[in-house]
């Protein structure tokens, strides 16, 4: 099993770690980028949105990922963000996994990168929110990684400092190295 930024309580919960509610509450601490105006050139097309993401985050989301997140206007511009059913709906009735008896690789971003726009911001409110979020994220995600590591003796847990949630995009070389190393132990 390979968990790319997915070793959270929905995937492993033996009752000793943080809850999904704690992770959902954490999202509220994160600084929020101001929404783009409808005339923003970054919304002219999905390719333009990818380039805007590259400037803001330092990497690009695949076009398919963006098309799942955003609607398309009749003139092919990027539209509004789609309503996601939400974590609560998605997680309702999910089986709790408290035992994983197979080899596993779990890669965590600890702490998560907040994006170039946050690093470049000089706004005091953004800086304060970023600091609070980073401290809470570090504590909570470190706790979950430790619970995963202690609760799944067959796991190799990797912590990538400052990676994005999309670790395979922000830290592709690290992910490939860890995957190759993990797969070599299965032979």
Label each PLM-derived region with a short phrase.
Residues 2-12:
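Active-site nucleophile loop of the alpha/beta-hydrolase fold
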Residues 10, 14, 30, 186-187:
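A general structural signal marking secondary-structure boundaries and capping sites
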Residues 3-4, 105-109, 159:
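Short beta-strand segments
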Residues 13, 20, 24, 170-171, ...:
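Charge-rich, low-complexity amphipathic helices
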Residues 15-147:
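Alpha/beta-hydrolase
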Residues 7-9, 110-114, 163-166, 174:
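Short, solvent-exposed loop/turn segments at secondary-structure junctions
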Residues 143-187:
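Catalytic active-site module of serine/aspartate enzymes centered on a nucleophile-bearing elbow/loop
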């Amino acid at each position: 099993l390979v968990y790319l930024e997915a070793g959270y309580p929905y995937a492993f919960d033996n009752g000793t770690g943080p809850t999904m509610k704690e992770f959902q509450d954490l999202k509220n601490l994160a600084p929020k980028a101001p929404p783009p105006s409808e005339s923003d050139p970054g919304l002219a097309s999905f390719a333009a949105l990818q380039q805007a993401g590259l400037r803001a985050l330092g990497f690009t989301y695949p076009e398919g990922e963006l098309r799942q997140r955003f609607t398309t206007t009749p003139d092919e511009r990027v539209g509004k963000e789609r309503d996601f059913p939400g974590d609560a709906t998605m997680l309702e009735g999910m089986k709790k996994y408290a035992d994983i008896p197979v080899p596993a690789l779990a890669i965590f971003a600890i702490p998560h990168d907040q994006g170039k726009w946050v690093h470049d911001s000089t706004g005091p409110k953004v800086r304060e929110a970023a600091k609070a979020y980073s401290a809470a994220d570090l504590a909570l995600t470190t706790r979950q990684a430790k619970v995963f590591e202690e609760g799944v003796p067959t796991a190799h847990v990797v912590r990538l400092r400052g990676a994005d949630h999309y670790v395979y995009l922000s830290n592709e070389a690290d992910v490939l190295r860890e995957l190759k190393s993990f797969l070599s132990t299965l032979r």
